[in-house]
Amino acid sequence: MKKILCLLLFVIISESSIAQGYHNPIIPGYHPDPSVCRVGSDFYLVNSSFQYFPGVPVFHSKDLINWEQIGNVLTRDSQLPLKGASSWLGIYAPTIRYNDGTYYMITTNVGHGGNFLVTATNPMGPWSEPIWLSQQGIDPSLYFENGKVYMCSNPGDAVWLSEIDVKTGKQLSKSCMLWQGDGGRYPEGPHIYKKDGYYYLLISEGGTELAHHLTIARSRNIYGPYESNPANPILTNCSRKGQNLQIQGTGHGDFVQAKDGSWWLVFLAYRNFGGSYHHLGRETYLAPVEWKTGEWPVVNGGNPIDTLINATTLPKQMMPQAQPLDFNRADLGPEYIHIQNPISENYIFKSNKLLLKGHGSLSDNNQPTFIGKRQEQVCGSVEFKVHPKHNAEGGISVYQINDGHYDLFVKDGRVSLRCKLKNIDYILKSDKIWSEWMNLRVSYNDKMYKFEYSDDGTSYKSLGELNCSLLSSEVAGGFTGVVIGMYADGGDVEFAQ
């Protein structure tokens, strides 16, 4: 009886602790470079999207813990040209801000025009056409004060500031260098905040890998000079206490103050699996901030970031629910994305089926016919019925980069598993099939992807397993994470649930 009471007490205490805290990441899967703003009781957050279309996902939350994607900022080809963009190019590090009834999103389209901003009166859109900006560098940010608008970015390995006209994009003042950081490489991702008479300048340093970290400086004048925080870095897991944690690469953050006066930091990090490999990409995390009057901000009590964060002011974290696909809709939802700008006539929704018209290989950078979703969960599965016509190839791709993907596909009466890794391109296994429609299934955990097929949806046969680590950023490369989706090449392919 005593053992039962002790066990019951342990369970109650454990559940109570979880209810008072939350688990990171708050937005799992490839959602890097978060920026956030609060409007009344509502929080809005955006992320980088690189080569994918539509660009810059927009999330909404009432509590900083539970987030829902409500759309994408860049939904038109005229806003987001991505022709030939690899996973190293495209949309870098957006910033979202709200001022006087208008939402602003400023970002960089690397390889296709540089820095620009768009505006909207509703964060769900529609957003304006791009207003192009002359100040160079990446990771631009906006700061509004007394009718003036300032833009900061990082040309030349330093943070520079200028005043701009947000209606025309015209630069109204000469660019002024503010800070070169605290000695780490790649000072980037700048954001300016004003508090207690100081202008605080938050930046990332160290590059977006293992040594990524956040530093901060402040000044009484927006143009400087800026003094470094003696306690820099204010966020890092590349430390004695944090180096052995699963979460690494903490950096690129944005402060936000909740309605109750508390301060919080959203930032990117990644989770290592099977050693020092991450394949899900850089994800969005949250940490509490103590920011006393006139003092420097302290993130998470000065401790490294772990999966469970204790924060009694936040509500219960809800578990996300998987939503079934509806092929009767012409829009599968804002979370579904294409590699580069899609050719619209290659995607036809009809009679609860999706017809994909093949256009180029997944290994090329030429608008392949592909529609997928970021892999957000460590464990799960994806399954579709596939019917290629004539000599077409179609199936499911576990896609990290054009030089790194696993493809389970049907072609010419065979079902095959292909592994594409840089210069390696081979068929792991191929079986003869007789059914026109074939069920394809990809299931996964933290170590392996398993590839199976069935002609009746009940009895499945395995074609093999492939390691998650080979699609990691450390091996395959790129700035993104795994996206799992449907594709077609060389002809028409039908998909059904």
Task: Please annotate each region the language model reported.
Residues 4-13:
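Sec-dependent N-terminal signal peptides
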